[in-house]
């Protein structure tokens, strides 16, 4: 083996080397990471919580009180501390995915549980029995919390929850309450970065698709830079259209009716796009094309939703259907479409009401069976588009930093309000946890030392959560 080859071999072996720690040494190093990260996150807790400024790779810093945002921004140079931090980040992220808020409290509880558990292990207690005492008694606390919940449904209750969740901002409280009033408690409310000084609430009735026209040549109103048609046909497919021959047969039938056509496809390009634009400019065909929204299964589901809402048929090669064989009966219809460079709004779809109701019920069943926040948001969005409308809160501010800070605040308040509508509210400030943990005291009887310790760890963490809000 040459000297160079030996050096390469040594470098590879060194790169794969692992630093091993065991027992209390490993736990103590992890605890440092848990403590440091939790200190930063918990500083944002409650109405008196502090803002945290986060340096970004580019642009101005981000100012936020959102626990999971702070947690995810932290990375330590020490890899052991970083491992400990990752434990807490995972908890915060999971809490955010499931509940949408409460990440700071989750971080606080995680720190206390880990800290107290290390004390138990250092005392020589059996970790499996301690864990058993903790996990079994958590169920009892959850049941007690469920008993003390109060349902939230009226506009005033929604306003109060939103205001409290937004650090007492009645302006944000009214904004969120108005949004729920506009689209209903199951409707979709999205928060976007605005371009004005003040916050704005826009309600879109009908079905809004987050895709604009493929080419600006499809505009028919140069002032508003939009394309608007009344009583159009709608072609719905997940097929990429790159040849005019694919759509020539159906276009011939559409031209004879004199009605406009909205094409929703995976993409429209090549001579197909060029021919559509030429015919539109010449006035021989009223047409506009947009790309299908979403990706993967979500794209297919959304296209099927559009088909149901407009009384059309979803044309897909997976279903054995080809564009060349599309008939006029396969096309959807609606009263009006408005297409901008960013989105498309379908008003007055001609879908069968019973079919739309059945589709909505199916989505509701899927909602009850998912725990993923991403899937929940997508299902809610689909449901709202089928049943009513979408409310968009555009966040305003004097500059990018202020807009970002306000957006985080509104996001948290919206998520907390939505959770309150779904599952109710309990006494705040850690009081509900403290009261619920009282149910654990009788359960400590006739238990071994390890299980009793596990129960006490849960109780102590709840007491700390309550005191931290003071």
Curated annotation (Swiss-Prot):
Q: Which GO terms describe its molecular function?
A: ATP binding; ATP-dependent protein folding chaperone
Q: Name one GO biological process term.
A: protein refolding
Q: What is its main location?
A: other
InterPro entries for this protein: Chaperonin_Cpn60_CS (IPR018370), Cpn60/GroEL (IPR001844), Cpn60/GroEL/TCP-1 (IPR002423), GroEL-like_apical_dom_sf (IPR027409), GROEL-like_equatorial_sf (IPR027413), TCP-1-like_intermed_sf (IPR027410)
* Localization of this protein: Hydrogenosome
Superkingdom of origin: Eukaryota
CDD domains named among the record's database cross-references: GroEL
According to the UniProt record, one GO cellular component term is: hydrogenosome
Q: Which UniProt keywords apply?
A: ATP-binding, Chaperone, Hydrogenosome, Nucleotide-binding
**Per the similarity annotation, which family is this?**
Belongs to the chaperonin (HSP60) family.
What function does this protein fulfil? Answer: Implicated in hydrogenosomal protein import and macromolecular assembly. May facilitate the correct folding of imported proteins. May also prevent misfolding and promote the refolding and proper assembly of unfolded polypeptides generated under stress conditions in the hydrogenosome (Potential).
Q: What is this protein called?
A: Hydrogenosomal chaperonin HSP60
Species name: Trichomonas vaginalis
Protein encoded by which gene: HSP60
């Amino acid at each position: 083996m040459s000297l160079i080859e030996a050096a390469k071999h040594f470098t590879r072996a060194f790169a794969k080397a692992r630093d091993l720690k065991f027992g209390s040494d490993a736990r103590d190093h992890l605890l440092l990471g848990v403590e440091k990260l939790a200190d930063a996150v918990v500083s944002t807790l409650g109405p008196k919580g502090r803002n945290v400024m986060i340096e970004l790779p580019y642009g101005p810093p981000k100012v936020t009180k959102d626990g999971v945002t702070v947690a995810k921004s932290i990375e330590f140079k020490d890899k052991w501390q970083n491992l400990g931090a990752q434990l807490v980040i995972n908890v915060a992220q999971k809490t955010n995915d499931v509940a949408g808020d409460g990440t700071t409290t989750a971080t606080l509880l995680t720190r206390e549980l880990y800290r107290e558990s290390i004390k138990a292990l250092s005392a020589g207690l059996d970790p499996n029995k301690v864990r058993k005492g903790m996990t079994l008694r958590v169920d009892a606390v959850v049941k007690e919390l469920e008993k003390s919940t109060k349902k939230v449904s009226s506009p005033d209750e929604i306003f109060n929850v939103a205001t409290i969740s937004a650090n007492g901002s009645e302006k944000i409280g009214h904004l969120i309450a108005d949004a729920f009033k506009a689209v209903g408690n199951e409707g979709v409310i999205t928060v976007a970065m605005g371009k004005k000084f003040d916050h704005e609430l826009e309600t879109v009735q009908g079905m809004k698709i987050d895709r604009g026209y493929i080419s600006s040549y499809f505009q028919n109103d140069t002032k508003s830079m939009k394309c608007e048609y009344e009583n159009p046909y709608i072609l719905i497919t997940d097929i990429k259209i790159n040849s005019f021959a694919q759509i020539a047969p159906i276009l011939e039938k559409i031209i004879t009716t004199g009605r406009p056509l909205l094409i929703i496809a995976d993409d429209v390009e090549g001579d197909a796009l060029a021919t559509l634009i030429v015919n539109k400019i010449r006035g021989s065909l009223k047409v506009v094309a947009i790309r299908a929204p979403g990706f993967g299964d979500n794209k297919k589901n959304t296209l099927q939703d559009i088909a149901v809402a407009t009384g059309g048929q979803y044309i897909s090669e997976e279903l054995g259907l080809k564009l060349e064989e599309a008939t006029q009966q396969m096309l959807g219809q609606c009263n009006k479409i408005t297409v901008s460079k960013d989105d498309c709004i379908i008003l007055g779809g001609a879908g069968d009401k019973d079919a739309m109701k059945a589709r909505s019920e199916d989505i509701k069943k899927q909602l009850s069976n998912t725990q993923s926040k991403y899937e929940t948001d997508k299902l809610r969005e689909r449901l709202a588009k089928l049943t009513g409308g979408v409310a968009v809160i555009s966040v305003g501010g004097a500059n990018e930093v202020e807009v970002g800070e306000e957006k985080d605040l509104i996001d948290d308040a919206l998520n907390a309000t939505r959770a309150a509508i779904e599952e109710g509210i309990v006494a705040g400030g850690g009081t509900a946890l403290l009261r619920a943990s009282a149910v654990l005291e009788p359960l400590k009887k006739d238990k071994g030392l390890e299980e009793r310790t596990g129960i006490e760890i849960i109780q102590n963490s709840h007491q700390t959560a309550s005191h931290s809000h003071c």
